[in-house]
From Swiss-Prot:
Subcellular location: Cell membrane; Perikaryon; Cell projection, Axon; Synapse
Tissue: Expressed in neurons including the I1 and I3 pharyngeal interneurons, NSM and VNC motor neurons, HSN and CAN neurons, the ALM and PLM touch receptor neurons and other unidentified head neurons. Expressed in AVG interneurons. Also expressed in somatic muscles, the excretory canal, the excretory cell and the hypodermis.
Pfam families with a match to the protein in the record: fn3, I-set, Ig_3
Protein's GO biological process: axon guidance; dendrite self-avoidance; determination of left/right asymmetry in nervous system; dorsal/ventral axon guidance; embryo development ending in birth or egg hatching; epithelial tube morphogenesis; homophilic cell adhesion via plasma membrane adhesion molecules; motor neuron axon guidance
Coiled coil: none
Function summary: Probable cell adhesion protein involved in patterning of the nervous system, playing a role in ALM and PLM touch receptor axon growth and VNC axon navigation. By associating with the transmembrane protein sax-7, mediates axonal interactions to establish synaptic connections between the AVG interneuron and the two PHC sensory neurons. Also required for non-neuronal cell migration in the excretory canal, regulating excretory canal elongation and excretory cell morphogenesis. Plays a role in regulating male mating behavior.
InterPro entries membership: CTDL_fold, FN3_dom, FN3_sf, Ig-like_dom, Ig-like_dom_sf, Ig-like_fold, Ig_I-set, Ig_sub
Primary site of residence: membrane
Residues spanning the signal sequence: 1-19
GO cellular component, one term: cytoplasm
The name this protein goes by in its record: Contactin rig-6
Propeptide segments, given as residue ranges: 1178-1196
Amino acid sequence: MMMLIRCISIFLLFGFVNALIDEASCPIGWQIASDQCVRIVIAPANLKHSKKYCHHEGGELMDTSVTLLLEDVMDLLKNLHENGLSEPTFHVGGMGQALNRTEDGNYKIITINPSSHFPFICSLNKMARRSLLFQQKLLPVGAPQISLTGQSEIYFHPRHDADYIALPCTVQGNPKPTVAWYKNDVEVLSPSMSNVSYLLSGGNLLVPASSTLAYSSFHCTARNSLGEVRSPPILLKPSFIDPFRPHRLDVYSLATGGAKLDCDAPAHQPKSLTYSWLYGSSTDRILSQNERKFISLDGTLFFSYVTAEDEDSYACSLSVYSTQSGHYGPFFRLISSTPKLVNSTFPPKLDSTQPQIFPEDPKVGDSIYLECFAYASPLPQYKWSRVDGKPIPARSHISNYGRVLKIEKVNYGDAGKYKCVAMNAFGSAAGEVHVKLRAPPSILQGLHDRLVPTESNVSFECLLSNADSYSSVEWFKDAKPIVPLLLPAEKRKRLKIDHNVLHLKFADETDSGVYQCVASNDVGSSSSSALLTVKDSAPVFPPNAMSRKVFAAFGSTVSIPCIFEASPRFHGKWADAGGSKLPQKGRIRDEEGVISIEKVLHEDAGLFFCTAHNKLGKAHAQVQLIVVNKPSIKTNFLDEETVNMSCEVELTCENSAECPEALFEWKINDRPAKEYPSLKSKVHEKKSGHKGRHLKQKVDLEVPKSLAGSRQIGRFACSSLYGGSSEFVTKPQLPSPIALTVEQMDEDGKKKKMFRLRWRLPPQHRDTRDHSPKVEGYLVELRTRKNRKWRAAERQLVGNMEKDSITVENLLPNTEYQFRVRSVESAAIGEPSIPSDWVKTAPGAPSETIDNLKWRSLDSQTLLVEWQPIEIGQESSGDNLRYRVSWSEATVGKNATDDMKLSNQDDDFENHLDSDQPQAILKLNTTEGCRMVVLAVRPVNDQGNGSVGTDTIAFLNSHGELKKVSLHNVKPINASHVNISWTWDNTSDCDTKHAVQITCINLSGSEISATVASDRIFWMLGGLEAETAYDCDLKAIDNHGSFGPASKKFRIHTKQHPPSETPLIGKLMMKQMKDTYTTILEWSSIELQKPNRTENGCGYKIFIYISETATEAIELDMPLQRLSDRRNPSARLDGLKLMYMYTIKVAGYNPGGIGPISEPRSIRLGSPGTMDYTTGSSDVPIPSLLLLLLLLLWRL
């Protein structure tokens, strides 16, 4: 039996970092492609500068030899092209190589002049990827964001009764952002203010459908501690339809024999495409279209030729959906001017308006209609084609006897000229219509978060397509417009806006915040935002960022990065144990902060030092490299039933307790041993030598007969903390399937979410004389466009399996998949096949159900219903997702849920409406007294209906009684704030509640009030005067300003004034103790409490900031009772770390709150001038504050 032992070059990089960062993700500003991270840089450069840029970012020009990487990058480029990117050529790795877009939309590698300027593509190596991910942890996360709806205009029908318009504002961030709304740039509603004219529903705003809001502009903002963003404005436009003219003249047929009746529609908004015609002087007789009669989408009625029966009276009818009304015009007569031509024949002649397109200015994503009508006798046939020779889009279909070509969801590829030909036996006529598409501006590459040091230059670019280069671009900082002319002169010099690029010079900390660009045109807006953090910090090596010891196997290659936090950031410098800097070339070298040692030798072991410094300071870290022999594998065939394999590591440590566990891991045919439950392993450890300095660690693996039959086991690999080794036991390789194809399966004529994969094995495997192992099955792997990582198909996805095919089912609808297949036998898995082409599942009905269904009564006939939206951040299951709200009404006392019990669960209640937002406003029938409404919501789309979630019962009362509210508890917090909580009366479900109003009046008559939404049961009331009594009550209030019964009055007393004086820090020094050191802080005493008052709750607060620029402090209390000398207060700060920079502030406090905070004092412990060598003459003990545990928790 032949065996091959192979050494695997495995080196220990800091494994614990894996727990700190997600190495499967890409750093900010990079995109995942296959298993790598890439950046597509649009700014053109020559080959030299492209390489320099990629190298500066920690990467290199993309390697085109990796097939999966190349395919994924091509997909990214195709997406950019579809969004408007016109650049066809990109520099990639290799001398003079580039990716070039071909006429068929694919990309191929070409050779170009290296001095030519083109965009380029960088990819990150693993070390740089890890380093950037770690450095990225310095960036604050959770800046607010607003998900755009794409709506720039909303039409509404003004009403006198209560009706509302829902304006969407979906926000994200951590901490959760607060939402405020503005009307014409004036704030109208936020969580801290109330306005009975508006309702805040989650982040969405409900405004009354009043004519006073016509042409008003609304926008929302989202704000948290990191910054603020704003949405593009939404313009409210009233829907209306004017009356038709009362009279119109009769119409005569055309000389050709046909007829054209214009609708002569009145002014209306929005423009309607819904027309019909009445005839016979009756509003009950509606004209039907046929091969001879055609109603255009602009309302025109055409006759191919006129017969005697067509001489009748006609009237045009127009309806506008958003007004839920329509009008019809006066009746008039059609008179044939050429009766002799009734039975004549003539060739087709297109009307002067034909062909035409609807809507007239189509947008990307619209469904468009191309119309073509010709006068002719006999009736003509119609034929559609594209002038450029391309096929008609697959999303199109022809209707209305060939006269209408409809194209669903048009994209830029559908633009161009279309030709219509009308033909009969006597001739033909042709015409062309040009499809020009519009769209909101497309931001090809958005802004991304940045961390920069002070005095650096920063640029943000909203990269627009060439077609959008003339769009309007506005810039905002924390939701405020950036207008250079309105800025102070100093800042105006530093800031420059060049259309879609913002330049900021010599940045300082006041420039930190959320920057946002909004690109707009007459179609809509697009927006992108990013958080800029301007911060200086001295280099710090975070705990657990670098291992104190690195173990490397003899003969392997090891790389050790210098990982630290700093701003500004430079590469760390490595030196050996003697202090000599490592060279940049050679077997042992420093590659911009990364030690690289090739073919590790035993004499390479020892200490290495990394030094990081910037203008604020310097920091050091040391790493000990320990070289060990690679693990060895021994194979012992015990009998025909069992094989025993052992993997052994031998190393020497100063103390065996310091030798880390080897952490062995076995793999069989590249799959973890834990996937083979029949395997058994056992770990041994043996010590020898003085004090156990010599250590052997061994793991045994027992392989049973089921895997060891015929001694053809496969490949066994043992890896450990110190390296790895593997053993091949002779065995023919399993063949990889070839010629993989994918067939979409149909059932009952409907496309299902299932595919049939077919393949074949290579010819040599089918010849059993080569003693190839028997293939016992196949493993299907898949990935999606959105998640490009290969993974095994779950069991529920794999259906019927045959010799050379398999069914994959239960896939997500409307999702693109790629598949590959591996051969499998009992102890081995073969290499994967070449991936299949991308295939897309058919759209389907929504599979998610609605959660968190809530309701609120707006009045006795109006309900606001809200729920959690579905399909957030994922592919939509089908077209036109919306929500169907259905309800059933009943008076209290009748079981309203009987309707649901008697009906099919898949049926809706008798009343229902569809909403494209996760809320709806229901107008109910007028009913006296109390009633309950059973509500149900299901998601639906054009492909079908989803399932109904849990029903909810709402209660309404036509008498408008408001619930009674009662005080639960009141607790003064400080001199100006008090916490109030309450409960609602539950004796009746029908009493309504919209909000609660808190009203407090002091003895001098000064009033403070606050209105709080009904879903809150507590509120912190602020703005109160110190040491003042207030009489308060609670009342329910509805959205019309009507109040319910007041609660029983209660009195509150605010606390005293906080201290008014500011402490002064006198001494901040490091002091040597007997066995250690401490930090002494002294400050001036202030008056904390008025005379003759208790000292309970009085003292000083010490604020400790780790670094000069930290924004969050550790707060420590020093109660007055703990001070040994109240006239000269001081404290010992134990647990501070050497060489760390700390900033200290002090403030006094009493039950009324915290007083003014002192000026800061900073200290770097251990630096010259920070030691206090005096012994001191006083024996008064100084109270100590232990910080070590608190600091560790703060760092975590």
